[in-house]
Amino acid sequence: MALVPYTSPLDIVFYPVCAFLFCVIGFAFFATFIVSEMTTAKAQKNIFRELTLALIASMSLGLGLFFVLLAGGIYV
């Protein structure tokens, strides 16, 4: 039984595009999180909104970093 080489489900050409998109989305949610933290009064803060913004920003920036590494030739 011959081994079949692994091929990525996403073409290598799209790594920089995905890196850019995920980083932009992550920074947008991060900026929204920071602005909401600075402008909302302490009594009006909503923990679920804050956690949602932080989670989306964190996951998007993590995926963006992953694709930046892949685009740079560092295969993790």
Swiss-Prot record:
Subcellular location: Membrane
Keyword entries, A-Z: Membrane, Transmembrane, Transmembrane helix
Gene Ontology cellular-component terms listed: endoplasmic reticulum membrane; oligosaccharyltransferase complex
Family matches, as InterPro entries: TMEM258/Ost5
GO BP terms: response to endoplasmic reticulum stress
Origin: domain of life: Eukaryota
Spans traversing the lipid bilayer: 14-34, 54-74
A molecular function GO annotation: oligosaccharyltransferase complex binding
Main location, first listed in the record: membrane
Membrane protein topology class: Multi-pass membrane protein
PANTHER family in UniProt: TRANSMEMBRANE PROTEIN 258
Function text: Subunit of the oligosaccharyl transferase (OST) complex that catalyzes the initial transfer of a defined glycan (Glc(3)Man(9)GlcNAc(2) in eukaryotes) from the lipid carrier dolichol-pyrophosphate to an asparagine residue within an Asn-X-Ser/Thr consensus motif in nascent polypeptide chains, the first step in protein N-glycosylation. N-glycosylation occurs cotranslationally and the complex associates with the Sec61 complex at the channel-forming translocon complex that mediates protein translocation across the endoplasmic reticulum (ER). All subunits are required for a maximal enzyme activity.
Family, as annotated: Belongs to the OST5 family.
Summary of subunit composition and partner proteins: Component of the oligosaccharyltransferase (OST) complex.
Name of the protein this chain belongs to: Dolichyl-diphosphooligosaccharide--protein glycosyltransferase subunit OST5
